[in-house]
Amino acid sequence: MDFHRLLQHKQQRWQRSSYLLIGLFLSVCVLYLLVGELWLSPFSAWSSLEQQLVWELRLPRLLAAAVIGASLAVAGATLQVLLGNVLAEPGVVGVSGGASVAMVILLLFFPSLNSPVAFMAAAVLGALLFTLLLVVMARKLRLTTARLLLVGVALGILSGAVVTWAFYFSDDLGLRQLMYWLMGSVAGVSWYQHLLSLVAVPVVIWLVLQGGVLDKLMLGEGHAKQLGIDIHRVRWRLILAIALLVGASVALGGVIGFVGLVVPHLLRLTLGSENRLLLPLSALCGALLLVSADLIARLALGSGELPLGVVTTTLGAPIFIWMLVRNHDSC
């Protein structure tokens, strides 16, 4: 009876958290559409200019931030299970860097292929390559947490060096595009670019539904096989899903770090590590975090706006340092 009550209490806590996050997300979304350089009133009729501002500028940007936030948070939570490392995150371990390098190569050598589909394909290939490299090294070399992080940092440095070299071989327009992808931003996202969202959203939903499978993987390969899990097939599907989400996120908004690290970790600390419940809340909380961060980026400067990646890094870096200190014994 005590166990039943404990389980019921845990379920109620997850439900209350879900309702709270949904309410916060909807409130922030409404605020996002109303505030900016031109503030709008929800209680008065909007002019044609104000309607165009919302439908053509703010709403596509809002949806882009939400999709990227959900994608990175779910990808981060999945990557942590896949690598067996709570400090794994697409930006920290270099997966986002791989996507950015592939896009830089596309912009420099194939500038005529300037379309969301081409950006998506290049970013997914780069993210897939770096994800495969990390998984193979983590499994074959039995890397500890510290060494895996060092490998990820090294991959990030390598991708940063490639992008820096690209600066010197690009014209002014190319340089501006490269800076855009490097620093992360959803400014100027159009409805046409949301073709990428049509790829990301189904993958997010599919990964959210894999929570039970991830819970079995956390028990170890032996137990997972006994429970009927095809380890090889599941791992490849998860790798491809992570690459698709990271690639779509980088193609849509550039390199945005720490979302996939902060969101799953804080949810695990407060609500537990059951992936069946963690993944949907990670998607919701990731969307809430990035929409809020982009709102800060829009309002922080009176004459302009901050890059979204700068805001998320400012918020996430201290938490990452705290996590490193907290996990120093296992490192």
Swiss-Prot record:
Chief site of localization: membrane
GO cellular component entries: plasma membrane
Entry GO MF terms: transmembrane transporter activity; vitamin transmembrane transporter activity
Compartments in which it is found: Cell inner membrane
Keywords noted in UniProt: Cell inner membrane, Cell membrane, Membrane, Transmembrane, Transmembrane helix, Transport
Keyword Transmembrane assigned: yes
InterPro entries, A to Z: ABC_BtuC-like (IPR037294), ABC_transptr_BtuC (IPR023691), ABC_transptr_permease_BtuC (IPR000522)
Pfam families: FecCD (PF01032)
Any single GO BP term: cobalamin transport
Membrane topology classification: Multi-pass membrane protein
Transmembrane segments: 20-42, 62-84, 91-113, 117-136, 148-170, 190-209, 240-262, 277-299, 306-325
NCBIfam families reported in the protein's UniProt record: PRK03784.1
Entry similarity comment: Belongs to the binding-protein-dependent transport system permease family. FecCD subfamily.
Subunit structure: The complex is composed of two ATP-binding proteins (BtuD), two transmembrane proteins (BtuC) and a solute-binding protein (BtuF).
Stated role: Part of the ABC transporter complex BtuCDF involved in vitamin B12 import. Involved in the translocation of the substrate across the membrane.
Name recorded for this polypeptide: Vitamin B12 import system permease protein BtuC
Organism: Vibrio cholerae serotype O1 (strain ATCC 39315 / El Tor Inaba N16961)
Species lineage: Bacteria, Pseudomonadati, Pseudomonadota, Gammaproteobacteria, Vibrionales
